[in-house]
Amino acid sequence: MGDKYIGLAKKSDDITSAIELVKKVFDENNKKENFIFPQESLKLKNIVIVKIDDNIVATCLIHNRLLYFKGKKIPSAFLCFICVDKKMRGKGISKELMNFTIKICKKNKVELSFVIARKAVDYYYSKFSFFGFSNYPKILIKTSPKPTKTGLIFLKLKNSLINEIMDIYNNTHEKLIGAFHRDFINWKFIIKKGKTKGVNLNIIKDNDSTIGYICFKGVDIYEIALNEKKYYPLVLNKFLMDEKVNRINLHMGINHPVSKNLDNFDYTFSFRKCWYGGHMIRLNYNKEKFKILLNKKIQNNILTDEIFNIPLLDQL
C-alpha cells in the first residue's frame, strides 16, 4: 500500500473526488440515482477522506445539526455517505475512516453522532459504540371525510415562504425528543430533497393567514405542524377530501400534538421499535444527560419517554 493520508479534505479537488466516490459506491447498479448533498456538508472541514497515492479511496460526510432533547438544542451530526472503494475493502480502511471521523466530531464538541444504517451493516457501526434506537410510531386514521366549507388552502412550499413556517415547525418540534431544529438553510435542502423523494411539502393557509405546513406522499403524512390545536382535525378532514381517501397514515407518535386532537376520527396507535440498527446513535459526551437513551430497553414508561423517530426528510 502506498502513501496514505487520513484527514479532512484540503482542496476543492478532494470534494469533487469524494462526491465521485460516493456516487460510484452507492449507485453500483447504475440506476443513475439523483444524489443531493447539503451544502454545509460539502465544506472542507466536514469531509473526511482516506487517500492512498493521492487517490481518495474512502470518505465520510459530516452534516451538523441541532437535536431537540428535553427543551435544549444538542450539537449533533449525521455521519453520512460513509463508503470505501470496492477495490480497497478488507484492508482496515473503514475502521480508520470511522475512528478519525469520530475524533473530529469530539474535537468539534458534537455530543451525538447519528448514522442511518443499511440493514447489511447494522452490526458494523456497533463496533464504534453506535446503538440502534429506531422507533416507528404511527397513527392510522380510518374515517370518511365530512364535507365542510373552510377557508383552508394547501399551497406548494417554496423558498420564499419558508420564513412563514419556521417558528411553527420549531415551536411544535422542540418538545419532541429526537426532532431537529431547522433554520432557513436546512429548510432549503429539505424542499430540494422532498422533490427527489416525491414528497409533497405544502404550506397551509386559513384565508390569508399561514397556520402551518404538511409533508405527505399518498396517504402517508410524515410531518404536520400547526399554530393552533383547533386546526388539526380541520386540516386532516381537508386532506381526506382533497386526496379523496378514507384513511391516513400519520408517521408520528403520542407526543405529537396531533395525537391529542383526534376526537372526531376513528384512529389506532401502533408503535414498533428496532434496537439492533436502522437509526443509530453514538453518545460522544455527557452520557449521564442521555439516560433516556442508555436505558431505552428497561424503561417502565416507554411511551411517555418516547424517542421521536428521525423525520424522513432529516435523514441522511
Regions found by a protein language model. Give the residues of each.
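Short amphipathic alpha-helix that is part of the acyltransferase structural core
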Residues: 1-64, 71-78, 146-184, 219, ...
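Amide-forming acyltransferase catalytic core, primarily the GNAT-like/NAT-type
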Residues: 131-225, 229-230
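Residue-level detector of beta-strand face positions
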Residues: 47-49, 114, 201-203
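Conserved acetyl-CoA-binding loop-helix of GNAT-fold acetyltransferases
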Residues: 84, 90-103, 228-241
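Active-site/acyl-donor-binding loops of N-acyltransferases
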Residues: 122-148, 222-316
